[in-house]
A protein has these predicted regions:
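Short, functionally important secondary-structure microenvironments
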Residues: 1-292
Length: 292
């Protein structure tokens, strides 16, 4: 077992170096990711936990859970995760100020239009912000590395709960990526009203280009508005499988908001939802700065 772990650690190190050196040419100015192999008794073992701290260091943490049998599959996944976290630093939110402004946008939308829902918005805003940021960075990475990004996204969805049984608002991030990428993520959504809402949201993410930093706040507002509207629909009319939207279902798939906040620092990125506060900073939460 220990020998295998060392092999996987070596593969991870080489894959990370290939991204930092081969794709970003050692120009990032952030430390190399810290890696860890999680044990089966760890709460995040099935999905792993991946995030970047949004602070002065922008330290990436890659905590790998259940490992694939194929070394090549693992190597490809490490590269995808590394690119994902790097792009939270390079693209969205890009800096601490933008991260905090994205959180404020979501809080403002909630307080002005949806405060009657009774959601703990200070707790939830990080996850929602991380979802919006993930759409942006994953779409950028999809157009740069389509096959690797697509395979990783499909596998990630399959690691979570059965997405067909998830409420509408919990599918929003994945369906929006599917619409933007123009290719199937094997979600096989049949709710035509929901698909129309997603198409409209995807068009708003396309305005001025997916990477336009001046548009990030507007895109975050539109995502939050759509998210809360779908949340209401889920409360009033649960899907056919009887799954009712609840506040805890914002990341039914432990993949949504890799944003969880630790120690007051926000982290973004990974794709796993951690009960606390979300951290972006990749891909979730406030104050701090970390993203998943």
């Amino acid at each position: 077992m220990s020998d295998n772990i060392e092999i996987y650690q070596d593969i991870a190190i080489h894959a990370i170096e290939s991204v930092f050196e081969g794709e970003y040419h050692n120009t990032l100015g952030i430390p190399m990711p810290q890696i860890k192999i999680l044990m089966p008794d760890d709460a995040d073992y099935i999905t792993g936990q991946y995030y970047i701290m949004i602070d002065d260091t922008w330290q990436i943490h890659l905590n790998f859970g259940k490992l694939p049998i194929s070394f090549k599959e693992f190597e490809d996944e490490v590269k995808v995760l590394t690119r994902h976290e790097i792009e939270h630093y390079m693209c969205c939110p890009f800096d601490v100020i933008t991260h905090l402004r994205m959180l404020k946008c979501i809080i403002d939308v909630y307080k002005k239009e949806f405060s009657h829902l009774g959601i703990d918005i200070q707790h939830a805003c990080g996850s929602i912000s991380n979802q919006a940021a993930d759409i942006i960075v994953d779409t950028k990475n999809y157009f740069r590395n389509p096959q690797d990004t697509l395979v990783s996204e499909i596998n990630w969805i399959k690691k979570g709960a059965n997405i067909k049984n998830c409420p509408r608002h919990s599918k929003l991030m994945f369906l929006t990526k599917e619409a933007l990428w123009g290719t199937s993520l094997e979600i096989n959504e049949t709710d035509h009203e929901l698909l129309g809402i997603v198409r409209d949201l995807a068009e708003k993410f396309k305005v001025n280009g997916i990477e336009d930093k001046a548009s990030f706040l507007n895109k975050t507002k539109e995502y939050a508005r759509t998210f809360f509207s779908l949340y209401i629909k889920d409360q009033l009319s649960p899907n056919d499988d009887g799954q009712q939207g609840s506040q805890s279902q914002q990341g039914d798939q432990s993949q949504q908001g890799g944003q969880s906040q630790q120690g007051g620092q926000s982290q973004q990125g990974g794709q796993s939802q951690q009960g606390g506060q979300s951290q972006q900073g990749g891909q979730s939460q406030q104050g701090g700065q970390s993203q998943q």
